[in-house]
Amino acid sequence: MNEYVIAYSYKGQRRYEHIFARTPDEAKDLFRGRHIERIESCVLAKYSPN
């Protein structure tokens, strides 16, 4: 399983920017000090149509 977090940062005018990261600390580093509205955990899986 590929466990990640999704971090959301408000960009203004009801728009959010989101990133996938392996840990909340990595998400904070990727946003370079910008305020993070929320962090959610998720599991990414490969999709196979067969």
Regions found by a protein language model. Name each.
Residues 32-50:
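Short, mixed-charge low-complexity intrinsically disordered segments
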Residues 11-13, 30, 35:
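A subset of signal/propeptide-processing and intrinsically disordered low-complexity segments
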Residues 7, 20, 37-40:
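Residues marking helix boundaries in flexible regions
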Residues 1-14:
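Short aromatic-glycine-(Arg/Gly/Cys) micro-motifs in beta-strand/loop hairpins
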Residues 24-30:
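Short, surface-exposed linear segments at secondary-structure transitions and domain or protein termini
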Residues 13-22:
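A short, exposed loop/beta-hairpin motif centered on an aromatic-Gly-Thr core
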